[in-house]
Amino acid sequence: MSRIGRLPITIPAGVDVTIDGDRVSVKGPKGQLEHSLPTPITATLEEGQVTVARPDDERESRSLHGLTRTLISNMVEGVTNGFSKQLEVVGTGYRVQAKGQDLEFALGYSHPVPVKAPQGITFTVEGNRVTVAGIDKQQVGETAANIRKLRRPDPYKGKGVRYAGEQIRRKAGKAGK
């Protein structure tokens, strides 16, 4: 039995979970999320807890068991508290500013780089810090990764877009004469 998969998911007050065949729907104060269960996996709702089960010990079933449990748990967490990632823009002349719901970066290119906010994602800008927030953990992480990809941190000078608290492995420059 999967150590993560066998743990029940406790449903907090104010969150409504509906299981309809192979669809799990979670509704809470911050919004609603849906997920379709993979074929061999089943989920049951009893006494304020969701339990995820698998029919057999085949390799595919075992691998999907813990994954499905964690995805449902993240949905419950997302509709109650939400998720956020912080990014820092580091470097001379590197800036970020909010343009309505979207962002505009100056990252040393000959043009400003616009970033549109996907559905369900909000951006907050404080100086050179950007906070990406939303209820879907995967979407928040993917949006933050796409922003970081615009100008990855340089290993020589450390300039670029990085996650808050990320340690950049610096390289020594040329030795010279």
UniProtKB/Swiss-Prot annotation:
Molecular function terms from GO: rRNA binding; structural constituent of ribosome
Name of one Pfam family that matches: Ribosomal_L6
Keywords: Ribonucleoprotein, Ribosomal protein, RNA-binding, rRNA-binding
Subunit text: Part of the 50S ribosomal subunit.
Organism in which the protein naturally occurs: Micrococcus luteus (strain ATCC 4698 / DSM 20030 / JCM 1464 / CCM 169 / CCUG 5858 / IAM 1056 / NBRC 3333 / NCIMB 9278 / NCTC 2665 / VKM Ac-2230)
Record-level GO cellular component terms: cytosolic large ribosomal subunit
Key word rRNA processing present: no
Name of the gene encoding the protein in the UniProt record: rplF
Keyword Heme attached: no
Function statement: This protein binds to the 23S rRNA, and is important in its secondary structure. It is located near the subunit interface in the base of the L7/L12 stalk, and near the tRNA binding site of the peptidyltransferase center.
Designated name of the protein: Large ribosomal subunit protein uL6
Taxonomic lineage of the native organism: Bacteria, Bacillati, Actinomycetota, Actinomycetes, Micrococcales
GO biological process: cytoplasmic translation
